[in-house]
Amino acid sequence: MEQAFIPSISVFQPHQIVCLEHEMSCLYAEVVQVATKRQICWVRPLLLSETLVAPSESDRPIVYDLRQGADLLWPVSLFRPALDTEVIPLLVQLETADREPESFQIARQQFNCFIQQVWQAYKSEFQAS
């Protein structure tokens, strides 16, 4: 699914959950601060949700825990407000998931891959105006 670029009518507020969509993945993050003059959003990633192309028996997305990872400073235009109804089930899935020792490393790799794909797809959004 391609991200729709809609000029930000309302500025995001601190602690608001936002979503950055790209293809079959969604990054959910908490807003820390917005630099309105530069249209940059400082966010703290919470989770990355990936929907499989082939439906599985559970139809639940794969969820990666990003709460121990790095923050991002990215263009506001890439984000949209996240709905409670979409975030809460993912957070529940995240909390009930088995904690394997290598899960943080896998989550970090998936996050890095996602960030690189988004950057490649929307390079023009990162150009200084």
Language-model regions, residue ranges each:
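Short, structured beta-strand/loop micro-motifs enriched in basic residues and often containing a Trp
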Residues: 1-3
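Short coil-to-beta transition motif at edge beta-strands of beta-rich domains
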Residues: 5-22
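Short beta-strand-centered aromatic/proline hotspots
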Residues: 26-36
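Short, solvent-exposed secondary-structure boundary/capping segments
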Residues: 38-46
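Intrinsically disordered, low-complexity, charged/polar segments
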Residues: 49-129
